[in-house]
Amino acid sequence: MVGNHSGTVAMDALMLSIAVHDEHPKARHLRLLGADLVFRMPVLSELTRKSGGTVACNADAERLLHTGELVGVFPEGFKGVGKHYRDRYKLQRFGRGGFVSAALRTGTPIVPVAIVGAEEIYPILADLKPLARLLKLPYFPVTPTFPWLGPLGLVPLPSKWLIEFCPPIPTADLVDSADDPMVIFNLADQVRETIQQALHRLLERRPDPFGR
């Protein structure tokens, strides 16, 4: 499963895992792939590993897919989760297409997923880059409540969430193209465009981010 990434912290990953477990007929467990930084943070690393998460690299992705696991990845990475609120729901660049290569090598279908709701929980108004560099973080967000309210600023705003699972994109006929840069680029672009269009549909269904 390939989703858009947003919301300052990876709350969308948690919500996607819950949605998959609750909506899948067999209550499948989603194995999430995370950035190296996640596994260098003491508490977060432990929680992520206990929930079945692993480092986002092709070797681990292919190993999980070969064993029939359901794998979740967010190709935008920190570019998506740390973007400003003014750029909400505008997909960022999809890295080098590693998720496509892993899917092709294992013949695994790619399921694009659009997630609406994360952008509003911690709206990023500014990024204090000097402080982020000092703390060795990809960004240091300033939101309407953080850091002004201290720990209270970490409480997420109550946005309305919508998640759409798009039709799977088959890859079984493209196994021999796993090393073809053009095939990888085109397929990654197809996934990205599918998610972007789904986001537009969801936003039309949810005109008020905090409405019920």
Model-derived features: where do they sit?
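Catalytic core of membrane glycerolipid acyltransferases/transacylases, capturing the structured
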Residues: 2-61, 66-67, 77-94
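Non-catalytic C-terminal accessory region of glycerolipid acyltransferases
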Residues: 63-212
